[in-house]
Amino acid sequence: FNSEDVFEIFINSYAELYDPHTNYFSPVNADRFEINMSKTFEGIGARLQQDIEYTTIFSIMPGGPAYRSKSLEKGDKIIGVAQGDEGNFEDIIGWRLDDVVSRIKGPKASVVRLLVIKKESSIDAFPDTVRLVRDRVDVVDEDATFDIVPFNSNDRQFNIGVIKIPSFYINFEDAQKGVKDYKSVTRDVKRCIDSLKTLSVDGIIIDLRNNGGGSLQEAIDLTGLFIETGPVVQIKSSNGRIEIEKDFDKQIHYDGPLLVLNNSFTASS
């Protein structure tokens, strides 16, 4: 543990005494939370993992700089990182994963160079130098997605659309800037519904199992796709005051047969 880890543990232990739903995020975990909410970040587009004292590639994100370069693959070891085309390499063997990630991530259009030992090479092999230009990376494999599940009942086949919603995400920064096509779960689910309508499904299942929560406003807006108007959620403060959050958009995007799935790991729904 470093000092930030210890401070985070202490503050969260203290906060839970008064409110089990209050959490403190260290700078590193706050950055992770922001990525989880916005489903986008600036970097090379690779998931990393700790393998004893080495940092290895766990997966490559489709469309990112690492994916486009075709120079990295799962299992490769990163042993050095350098900033720009002229920066000196830092030996990162034995580093914490958080510290390695902080060196590899960076602003869009900036250059990072990596010393990489390919997965099929021995650890004492001469490393390859991989030059990557950082870019905006969309975490598309954690977006809301849909599938069609057919089943038979009374000698009739039904096609049911299943929309999987992993979290209530939104890119707050783009939304506040007025970016026209900012990313949000409500927009993605709306596109899923449009696709399922085109395919003439007989009903829709909203799968919220293991949904960890996210933006309360997105949960309200998402509910608004299925109702005309009205109350969606109540918020009770410590002084007993109750606030009712409503959906005011009268447009109903889907009014057919609907089923919602959740489990004990479902939040904000």
Predicted regions and their residues:
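Extended, domain-scale alpha-helical bundle/helix-rich regions
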Residues: 1-43
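Cleft-lining beta-strand/loop regions that shape enzyme active-site pockets
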Residues: 25-41, 50, 56-61, 65-68, ...
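Conserved catalytic motifs of ABC-family nucleotide-binding domains
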Residues: 75
